[in-house]
């Protein structure tokens, strides 16, 4: 797969974590698959035939970590290593520091765990604008968000406002 320089720069940009717009706008099928993975997928979704630069791989590890932060409040380094396919604790800690504008996390190097205390951003939301070709079951969909908001609204009305 040959990637345009513009695509490589976008995927390697250390401050960019949202790729839905690129996924929607690209006409190239190979780039579309790559942007799909970066917008909605995790490192385990990456097909073996797609080779990433080290910076792109690092970005996908971080995006996978953002996904984990949306699911769990507390994580062990072992789970992070498994899900992000990272072998070194130092890389995990470096990623956590680099993601400080996405979430606030407290690291415990002794117990090799971490806790998320605040979240400032999340992954892209799939709203069925286009058919997915790589990701089978996107975690965050428009329906998922609407359901959670309705649930929260019900809880608010029943438990807090009464």
Swiss-Prot record:
Start and end residues of each PCI domain: 6-118
Keywords assigned by UniProt, alphabetized: Cytoplasm, Nucleus, Signalosome
Transmembrane segment boundaries: none
GO cellular component: COP9 signalosome; eukaryotic translation initiation factor 3 complex; nucleus
A Gene Ontology biological process term: cellular response to pheromone
Origin superkingdom: Eukaryota
Location(s), subcellular: Cytoplasm; Nucleus
Nucleus among keywords: yes
Protein purpose: Component of the COP9 signalosome (CSN) complex that acts as a regulator of the ubiquitin (Ubl) conjugation pathway by mediating the deneddylation of the cullin subunit of SCF-type E3 ubiquitin-protein ligase complexes. The CSN complex is involved in the regulation of the mating pheromone response.
Subunit-level organization: Component of a COP9 signalosome-like (CSN) complex, composed of at least RRI1/CSN5, CSN9, RRI2/CSN10, PCI8/CSN11, CSN12 and CSI1. In the complex, it probably interacts directly with CSN12 and CSI1. Also interacts with RPN5.
Note: Present with 358 molecules/cell in log phase SD medium.
Protein name (database record): COP9 signalosome complex subunit 9
Taxonomic path: Eukaryota, Fungi, Dikarya, Ascomycota, Saccharomycotina
